[in-house]
Amino acid sequence: YTPREFSLAQNYPNPFNPTTEISFAMDVASDVNLTIYNMLGQKVKVLENAYLAGGTHTYTWNGQDELGQSVSTGVYLYTLTSGNQTISKKMALMK
């Protein structure tokens, strides 16, 4: 099954603790970057940065940054970029 559009789903569960799933769909194969930012715009974690086939993809975030440290309670932004398209959504970590 190949989706008909580029889309980013709301993470589930939301709010989450300690993990959440982020899913997105692509109609064609493309370079993809899925990154989590804090509300100050600082990069927290890169979940994916690769060339992926068209279809639906799901990633799990464990609430940790690039150094493996647990991040604090709060709202985070996850951003999906593919080609010239970017979609962002908010999620909340509650401890």
Can you annotate each of these PLM segments?
Residues 69-95:
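C-terminal tail/sorting-segment detector
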Residues 59-71:
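Signal that preferentially marks extracellular ectodomain short beta-strand elements
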